[in-house]
Amino acid sequence: MTHRVINFYAGPAGLPLPALERAQQELLDFAGTGMSVMEVSHRSKEYDAVHEEAIVLTRELMGLPDNYKVLLLQGGAHLSFGMIPLNLLRGGRKADYIVTGNWAEKATKEAKLVAGDNVRVAASTKDEKFARLPKASELKIGEDSAFVHFTSNNTVEGTQWKEFPKTDKPYVCDMSSDIMWRPFDVSQFGLIYAGAQKNLGPSGVTLTIIREDFLEMCEASDLPSYLRYKLHAEKNSLYNTPPTFGIYILRNVLAYNKSIGGLKAIEANNRKKGELLYGCIDRHAGFYKGFVTEKADRSLMNVDFFLPNPELDDTFVKEAKKAGMVGLKGYRDIGGIRVSTYNAVSVQDVETLVGFMDEFARKNG
């Protein structure tokens, strides 16, 4: 077997090995076509089966009601930042954005370029370096708000909404870094979007889930065609040539997720990984210092912490790499260490890291 490292990169991130092995087996002859899936027409029945299976598996794993559409788009969260206000904030509609980190701030900035003062900041923890999430009492949400936008997991800062913001308004949510980490009730969500490259598949696919009443808000015939959610829904995400190989890998990952017990089993693994990693940080509190100030806000997808000095941070990363673990260097604006423990990272992988951390603290503390 080819040598594999333990991948803690924040994105693009590791993928389940069985999903990759399936792609390896089918790479040169997909579905008996004598071609790779990368070479097959997106209008062929062989590709169409993959496309539909990815949509069906998304619906099944997330328990989506019939009044939600699943779209397989491109452009990542960056394009979605603009598409959302272009489609949903027409005719003077207003929205409130909760700013909890680097990506939430970018989403707000892009929305303001489109809708100006109709995009309002409901709360921000920027003054505290986004080291915690806003409390319910800090949220200022207008009665005239069409939706409340938030980022469910803040990849850079390592905070996560395990309980969604308290409001009676519909949610629009960037779930790029924690989609499908657990089951949840989607009924309050008008739109969910997620770049695939952290928890679902390779870069190049943006999974978008939109409720039908929100789709009806998207009367946007004056927009360039690709920017219209309604058109993509009508064409079943085949208006243009889709990222076929990315969707194929997405299908493989979703099929694997189903085979291991779905989102309930995935949640159990994610919670166990969090217990192990945060347990180690708290056990060595004089050596490892977490970035997040409120324990309830700690992310189970991205864990940020610091060692006593930057030199030790660098040594930690280098020695971990020698031990077969990569992707641990912290985000450039924060520094320290960042461990990304997305769905594809196993409990055993985290146990290996925690063993390394215990020994590193013993030797250097």
Describe the role of every protein-language-model region.
Residues 5, 322, 331, 335-365:
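PLP-dependent enzyme catalytic core of the Aspartate aminotransferase-like
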Residues 172, 186-197, 206:
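Conserved active-site segment immediately N-terminal to the catalytic lysine
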Residues 78-146:
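PLP-dependent aminotransferase-like
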Residues 32-80, 87, 102, 110:
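Conserved N-terminal alpha-helix of the aminotransferase class I/II PLP-enzyme fold
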Residues 16, 196-278, 294, 365:
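Active-site C-terminal subdomain of aminotransferase-like
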Residues 288-319:
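Conserved PLP-binding catalytic core of the aspartate aminotransferase-like
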Residues 111, 124-179:
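Active-site phosphate-binding strand-loop segment of PLP-dependent enzymes
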Residues 1-41:
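N-terminal "arm"/small-domain region of PLP-dependent enzymes with the aminotransferase-like
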